[in-house]
């Protein structure tokens, strides 16, 4: 939900890139956490939520807000795409 609210605070045209940047920051923060044993100072513990909480966010609207639904669909699509790529890479390696 925090990622959707972070996207909602941005102009529509910036949302896809911002979503990818949040995912990249979460992965970087997770690597930092694993290497150093503590959370990244800016991006948190490696979760998407901790990255999103570090950004300006709109207040969470009701789920019948079409703009918020679009933001959540952007979040889910990015997560699904990233997962699908990981599954495909795993299959190629086996």
Feature-to-residue mapping (PLM):
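Acidic, Ser/Pro/Thr-rich low-complexity regulatory regions
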Residues: 1, 21-23, 35, 40, ...
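Short terminal alpha-helical segments
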Residues: 1-26
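Compositionally biased non-globular segments, especially hydrophobic aliphatic-rich helices
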Residues: 5-9, 29, 42, 77, ...
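Charged, low-complexity interaction regions
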Residues: 8-17, 31-35, 59-66
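Short alpha-helix boundary/capping elements
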Residues: 12, 23-34, 47, 80
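Short glycine-rich, low-complexity/disordered patches
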Residues: 17-22, 32-39, 85-93
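Charged/polar low-complexity intrinsically disordered segments, enriched in acidic residues
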Residues: 36, 40-61
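Amphipathic alpha-helical binding modules
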Residues: 53-94
